[in-house]
Amino acid sequence: EMCIRDSREIICPTEYGDIIPSDITLSAGVKEFYEKGRESLLKEALSDIGDEYDYIIIDTPPALNILTINAYVASDYIIVPMSSEILSLVGLTQLKETVDSVRLSLNPQIRILGILLTKFNSRTRLANEVKEMAESVALQMDTALFDNKIRSSVSVSEMPAHGMSIFKYAPRSKPAEDYLCFVREVIERIG
């Protein structure tokens, strides 16, 4: 909870924007989030700094837990990254139910902005089948796939080990190009 209260003190400026890094200790403190009314802790913490930024991006793990719920309560939009694999489709139904529940009780304006396919290889039949199925699921979720997909690349797998973004580690790679196009598409959709 200390980190939540002192958000301004832990902001780290970078050349791409300010970040508040997470670490393994965040999950250790998750029990504090289970008290009544704790779904809005992140929203409250960000309210102090929200006016200073055009966009605040909250990166969450794929798990649907109280930390993720906090992110949903604090957000206007959700972007769903999904690797181009069949098993990735399974969690979308549960995600929709969770978002609907948050919308009903905690954040009526939240909206799924779209589904972003990652590790995409348009030359494989599987990736194209997953894309078709994801398009169908997206319609059921009242959203759409992003036109841009993040192509698969060794550089995307390697960069976390080097502690760098794709723009630093492999700035001329296809995924770096894809992410730039994706950011433009997000800004367009938000308007």
Specify the residue positions occupied by each region the protein language model found:
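P-loop NTP-binding core
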Residues: 1-191
